[in-house]
Swiss-Prot record:
Higher taxonomy: Bacteria, Pseudomonadati, Pseudomonadota, Gammaproteobacteria, Pasteurellales
GO MF term list: ATP binding; DNA binding; helicase activity; hydrolase activity, acting on acid anhydrides
Protein name from the UniProt record: RNA polymerase-associated protein RapA
Disulfide partners: none
Pfam families: Helicase_C, RapA_C, SNF2-rel_dom, Tudor_1_RapA, Tudor_RapA
Protein's gene: rapA
Residues spanned by motif DEAH box: 285-288
Function: Transcription regulator that activates transcription by stimulating RNA polymerase (RNAP) recycling in case of stress conditions such as supercoiled DNA or high salt concentrations. Probably acts by releasing the RNAP, when it is trapped or immobilized on tightly supercoiled DNA. Does not activate transcription on linear DNA. Probably not involved in DNA repair.
Amino acid sequence: MFVVGQRWISESENNLGLGIVTASDNRTVTIQFPAAEEERIYALSVAPLTRVQFQKGDRINSVEGWQLDVEEVVENQGFIIYLGKRADSGEEAVLPEMQLDHKVSFSKPQDRLFSAQIDRSDRFALRYRALQHQQAQFQSPLRGMRGIRASLIPHQLHIAKEVGQRVAPRVLLADEVGLGKTIEAGMILQQQLFSGRVERVLVLVPESLQHQWLVEMLRRFNLKFSLFDEERCSDFDKADEDGNDVSENPFDSEALVIASIDWLESSPNRAKQVLASHWDMLIVDEAHHLAWSEDEPSVGYQFVERLSKQTPAVLLLTATPEQLGQESHFARLALLDADRFYDYHSFIAEQKDYKPVADAVATLLNDKPLSHDEQNSIAELLSEKDTEPMFKVINSEKSKENDRLQVRQELIRELIDRHGTSRVLFRNTRQGVKGFPHRVYHQITLEMPSQYTNALKVMGMMGGVTKDDQLYPERLFQRMNPAAKWADFDPRIEWLITFLKNHRDEKILVICKQADTAIALEQILREREAIRSAVFHEKMSIVERDRASAYFAQMEEGAQVLISSSIGSEGRNFQFASNLVLFNLPDNPDLLEQSIGRLDRIGQKNDIQIHVPCFENSMQMVLATWYHQGLNAFEETCPMGAALFREFGEELEGFLKNPQAVGFDEFLVRTFKRQQQLKAELEQGRDRLLELNSNGGEVAQALAEAIAKEDNNPHLVNFALSLFDVIGLEQEDLGEQSIVISPTGHMLVPDFPGIAEDGTTVTFDRQLALMREDVEFLTWDHPMIRNGIDLITSGYIGKSAISLLINKNLPAGTLLLEAIYMVETQAPKGLNLTRFLPPTPVRILLDNKGNDMAAQVSFAGLEKQLKPLNKQMANKIAKMAQADIKKLIGISEQKIAAKLPELIEKASQDADSTLSAELHRLTSLQAVNKNIRSDEIEALEQQRIESLKQIALANWRLDSLRVIVSNKE
């Protein structure tokens, strides 16, 4: 049976490669596996081995590296010799089986079937379902938005969908604080990455926000960005023996990069390297800090300007236009489209033209009759439409309410499309979005301890008292008395302990200036008072912060209080808590708003209680009073806070240095009066038309509801659990809608992407994921699911199977063939053809006469009737029925070839319809809205042409097959 020199493969250890018989006797056979450098000795009676014999038409590899197209197979004294022509030269050649490549693998399902590499039937089923789900996800309009670890906020989803599906989007995101600009940018980015339009991304942020972006992108979107600074870049600096610079560009080493714009401004060489690298998308946060004037733009602005000109997609995140001032606002728009926004004075004139229209929209929204002037403004802008009948419906008391509503909505839609900046600017306000809680301020006045008073006096006599020393005296005291403990006498500690004991059932966030303060506070609460507490600061790793956050989020056994440094809490939101204690007061209004913003977010269910313990007649008290009575910054968001701080900062400094100085009350009155004036100007400057476009209305609400509906669909849970089971991952149900997934020693793959060695806790529940940042939130967009699908569909799992069909109506031994074909295109990713023709599985189920029964016999229905076969019996069937199986495969190829034109035609119609409609819309709008870029229209037309061309080239391939043999029982 076995002859030395023959080639066999191990059925149980496919990874060993092609074996060669080195010895054989009456009881055993010895096989050498050169590729794996392994040897096995098998008992002849149970040897799990299959003889390798290629067929005419196969292309096989020699051990020397050349390939042979087999034309004839000759057997001589137990050895196989292959005759044919070399693939490289076409010359006739002979290849004895001993000279076959040792690393042979069988990728075609039929080759695997006939070489005894037969998989379990349940794995074949999982593979088919994975292919079906992959197809569905490629075509889902929710892709890139549903997987975010965040609440489903309609206006955010609307902006993300509107911008994320554009070709090379260039927009300004200018929502008010707390409305989620970072989340909007992340969802836009996610969609662009999924579609393949974007691969390399640069995020430029102020230095203080680098870690916030790193955390947000990882925790909310599962995007692993790399933080670049001078230390990291210096590792790439090199010189040759002659001292010539041969450095590599560090920015070419990663695809997703975060860098500080402050650093690049001060480092021309690094800025030059950034410009030399290629980026598909640029995101700039806090873009309003890029100073610009017509005569003297800043270094930072000029750098971003150069970068934006060579980067196709640009997202600028900025303060609201009213906060910026029109000149600064114009400068940001010019970064997005320099051809459109080329002259500031023309821009101002154009904006004035839209003011009457915005007023008219406000009237439409309030369901009031339009004035004569408002009608003229609308008619002028919609000059190509007959608006007179529409105005009659709106202004007539006899009109039906539903008719008035429809006309109002149509007019508003038309006006939005023609709005001056509606395609490049999105801005939502809290007033427009609604759903925010109230904020209630509680000032706690305490007597300053003598230890602090003495320390300030001593340092004052030495001439070394700083503003920080007076605002945060505990740091000064500790610096002067390293052995002493400020917490032993600071009355804020006792107040905090009492407060916590009086609010045992509530979650409380405490924010301090420094990490050391937070650490000391947490230790006292935990050790001295046995209060369940967690600490959160910048010295902790992201994993440690996740654990602290999760401990705080637990409702029953979790921490009552989380004590955080001001930097440590960046990027983290705790909407489930409604009590905020500012142990240290931030020293500017923006930082104050950031701190309150940890709780004051969309999704907060309760009014926010803000507690500020201050020392009487101190700098702390002056600042707190100015924030409250001057800016009203505790109880309302204060978008004009930075402007007021600049305007009154110098005068405020005098009162901070001398808390009892005369004139403070009058100063508060002046500040508040100016605050009210700026607030009124902001309200008057609100562009209701722009807000309406940014908000999304009913369409946005429907989008949120669609994702919520998918959240509750059991298909993902069922598929994921089957996936984990087949791969060999251990699953432990923790209750509370979470499970722990752990690796085992019998997995199909060495490691599964995203699973930690000690296990990973996952949930399919969005609300739990929002509360527990240490738990992975699984959706169809999550890398664990996407990688799992790729693992199944791109490998050999489930490619060939043999099953037993128990059916009394069929003669025993009846042969069926279930073939799964893939119809797909080989097109550039940037075309995003998967929307129209994703890799599409086509199931063909042939009986022994070659009839396709797939339409009559469902996959799920057939699956229930199938029984597994042991491997030995499956191999026997494959060998015995080889000729019949090959015949059925040939028939199935004819069937799929006949189906292909219909699939191509449908995909072509979908692509042409979708892309032509968008093209027509943009072309029509360009005539009435200058913000429709010509290059965007040209790119879309080119995309349409290329898409139709590539879809026409789609082809099929056999992905997997299952042989089914019937039996009576």
